[in-house]
Swiss-Prot record:
Gene Ontology terms describing biological process: amino acid transmembrane transport; asparagine transport; glutamine transport; sodium ion transport
GO CC entries: axon; lysosomal membrane; membrane; neuronal cell body
Regions crossing the membrane: 56-76, 82-102, 130-150, 179-199, 206-226, 240-260, 283-303, 320-340, 372-392, 396-416, 429-449
Family: Belongs to the amino acid/polyamine transporter 2 family.
One matching Pfam family: Aa_trans
Protein name per its UniProtKB record: Sodium-coupled neutral amino acid transporter 7
Entry keyword set: Amino-acid transport, Cell projection, Ion transport, Lysosome, Membrane, Phosphoprotein, Sodium, Sodium transport, Transmembrane, Transmembrane helix, Transport
Residues that bear Phosphoserine: 28
InterPro entries: AA_transpt_TM
Catalysis performed (reactions): L-asparagine(in) + Na(+)(in) = L-asparagine(out) + Na(+)(out); L-glutamine(in) + Na(+)(in) = L-glutamine(out) + Na(+)(out)
Main location: membrane
Subcellular location per the Swiss-Prot or TrEMBL entry: Lysosome membrane; Cell projection, Axon
Complex and partners: Interacts with the mTORC1 complex; this interaction mediates the recruitment of mTORC1 to the lysosome and its subsequent activation.
């Protein structure tokens, strides 16, 4: 096997080990990785973690499944029906799995343990900064989507509890959507977001898994045994245009994006080997595919092209089984928002400390003031935007393009740089194939990012 000469000296990339940029981000709630030491064995050696292969599959599935599930029936409608939606997901799955394997390979080569650290080490300073900015933006947008989801589910629950018709007009002020979102956010989300450390991640992980599987089960059951008042609208059989198919890309990328948290999972395994990891992510993505397809197909066929961007909004408020699903989603989002905010705040903190040239070991008072200020600004901005953005589809259409960067662009760049760093005088055909595949990933990811972002700006946000 060719020797890989990826530079592991942080100074050569213009980094400083005391500037905070090495913060661990988006680590899975179930992953526990000991800090690296100077003489530690690289991943794949005897210094592996404690996670079994089966445990790694569960963690990756958990990282993959989330709030994007609610938008999949609408994505099938956008793509042009069941056949187009299935074809698009199956085609994307190949690239999604390969991106996860590439990240594991580059993690071994660079001896780094988180997504952004791998990008920093393999691709250099500029790409590393872009990656961190993308992570911060992505987590910010996801927090907005979480608040919108809370408002969506609360509207339906309050309509039943207050025994009043849904929609504007005639409702008491305390049932107003903006008031209920703000009250919930200030009472629950803000206090959970301020602490320096997050110790409840395992509970959020459990709630997310239970809520996701329950929502999927309810949607499938409601399709098989529909209520009398639920009649589907037009069922599309083909896409209106090829552009319509690509408009479903953001939801798929947002739904399957687990790449940022995959690197810590890989390094937490007892035997962190690329071959074993390939089996782990293949099994995990097949499970996630089954969940997303079940939700997307049954939700779309139940409501047709009239399905809401949040599929649970399409069901009657009085349906108790769906009401339980809404409660699960709210609880899951309430605990997931602080985790995503923590990840985004860690990136911003690292960028700020690096820019200022400040050491991590500063006095506690300054760190606390800066943390509270960062949290308040983040919280208020996401809340303000969530109050005026009507549905999660518009948010996902924007951050889905960033998810494509995590799935395609950064892994592609890492693969190219890793292969270019191999010290071989004669490049075999496999070397050229890998470089070409990396170029394909970058090109495809850049196209998806550009097309979906432009569409989101000119069609969704400016409409």
């Amino acid at each position: 096997m060719a020797q890989v000469s990826i530079n592991r000296d942080l100074g050569e990339w213009g980094l400083s080990t005391d500037s905070g940029e090495r913060a661990r981000l988006l680590q899975s709630p179930s992953v526990d990785i000991a800090p690296k030491s100077e003489g530690e064995a690289p991943p794949g050696g005897v210094g592996g973690g404690t996670t079994s292969t089966l445990g790694a599959i569960f963690i990756v599935v958990n990282a993959c499944l989330g709030a994007g599930l609610l938008n999949f029936p609408a994505a099938f409608s956008t793509a042009g029906g069941v056949a187009a939606g299935i074809t698009l997901q199956m085609a994307m799955l190949v690239f999604i799995i390969s991106g996860l394997v590439i990240l594991a390979y580059c993690s071994q080569a660079s001896n780094e343990r988180t997504y952004q650290e791998v990008v920093w080490a393999v691709c250099g300073k500029l790409t590393g900064v872009l990656c961190e900015v993308a992570i911060a933006t992505y987590t910010f947008g996801t927090c907005i989507a979480f608040l919108i989801i809370i408002g969506d589910q609360q509207d339906k629950i309050i309509a039943v509890m207050a025994k009043e018709p849904e929609g504007p007009g005639g409702s008491p002020w305390y049932t107003d959507r903006k008031f209920t979102i703000s009250l919930t956010a200030f009472l629950f989300i803000l206090p959970l977001s301020i602490p320096r450390e997050i110790g409840f991640q395992k509970y959020a992980s459990f709630l997310s898994v239970v809520g996701t599987w329950y929502v999927t089960a309810i949607i499938i059951i409601k399709y098989i045994w529909p209520d009398k008042e639920m009649t589907p609208a037009d069922i599309l059989n083909r896409p209106a245009s090829w552009i319509a198919v690509f408009n479903a890309m953001p939801t798929i990328c947002f739904g399957f994006q687990c790449h940022v948290s995959s690197v810590p999972v890989f390094n937490s395994m007892r035997q962190p080997e690329v071959k074993t990891w390939g089996g782990v992510v293949t099994a995990a993505m097949v499970i996630a595919l089954a969940v997303y397809m079940g939700t997307g197909i049954c939700g779309f066929l139940t409501f047709g092209d009239a399905v809401d961007p949040d599929v649970l909004l399409s069901y009657p408020s009085e349906d108790m089984a769906v009401a339980v699903a809404r409660a699960f989603i709210i609880l899951s989002v309430l605990t997931s928002y602080p985790i995503l905010h923590f990840c985004g705040r860690a990136v911003i903190e690292g960028l700020w400390l690096r820019y200022q040239g400040m050491p991590v070991e500063e006095d506690v008072g300054r760190e606390r003031r800066r943390r509270v200020l960062q949290t308040l600004v983040w919280f208020l901005l996401t809340l303000l935007l969530a109050l005026f953005i009507p549905d999660i589809g518009k948010v996902i259409s924007v951050i889905g393009g960033l998810a494509a960067c995590f799935i395609f662009v950064f892994p592609g760049l890492c693969l190219i740089q890793a292969k270019l760093s191999e010290m071989e005088e004669v490049k075999p055909a496999s070397w050229w194939a890998m470089v070409s595949y990396g170029v394909l990933l970058v090109t495809l990811g850049a196209f998806i990012f550009g097309q979906t972002t432009a569409n989101a700006i000119f069609v969704d946000l400016l409409a």
